Swiss-Prot record:
PROSITE patterns: RIBOSOMAL_S19E
Assembly behavior: Component of the small ribosomal subunit.
An individual GO BP term: translation
Keyword Transit peptide in annotation: no
Cellular compartments per GO CC: cytosolic small ribosomal subunit; nucleus
Protein name from the UniProt record: Small ribosomal subunit protein eS19
Keywords: Cytoplasm, Nucleus, Ribonucleoprotein, Ribosomal protein
PANTHER family assigned to the protein according to its UniProt record, in alphabetical order: 40S RIBOSOMAL PROTEIN S19
Length: 145
């Protein structure tokens, strides 16, 4: 297990494993509005997956691991998409700012993320340690299959 980082594992498997860790640990509380919210104005429906909040939190944590100093505005760009306008041309639309802000705040409550003095948020040493440990577990599980 030692010596493996988040960069060494498949990103989809890692995000699923980290989301399962968040859900199983019980420290990450899912807000009440999670089942009724859309993830951006370009979306027509709310997400179908009931655990989407854990998956989004894991995805944001992985993104902060890869490049720190990312704030709410950058997260809305990352999770944006194509807005369909009927017969008119489609355009890019940003993701929900509220969802991005609440995800970052919940990661701060877990002490995995802290505010960067240069702007945005960055991963703490505790967060990096936990994510590297989970990456090592993902490597062990992927070698068994």
């Amino acid at each position: 297990m030692p010596g493996y980082t988040v960069k060494d594992v498949n990103q989809q498997e890692f995000v699923k494993a980290l989301a399962a860790f968040f859900k199983k640990s019980g420290k990450l509380k899912k807000p009440d509005w999670v089942d009724t919210v859309k993830l951006g104005k370009h979306k027509e429906l709310a997400p179908f997956d009931i655990d989407w909040y854990y998956i989004r939190t894991a995805s944001v944590a992985r993104h902060l691991y890869m490049r720190g100093g990312v704030g709410v505005g950058a997260m809305t760009k990352i999770y944006g998409g194509r807005q369909r306008n009927g017969t008119r041309p489609s355009h890019y639309s940003r993701g929900s700012r509220n969802v991005a802000r609440k995800v970052l705040q919940s990661l701060e409550m877990l002490k995995m993320v802290e505010k960067d003095p240069n702007g945005g948020r960055r991963l703490t040493s505790i967060g990096q340690r936990d994510m590297d440990r989970i990456a090592g577990q993902v490597v062990v599980l992927s070698k068994k299959h």
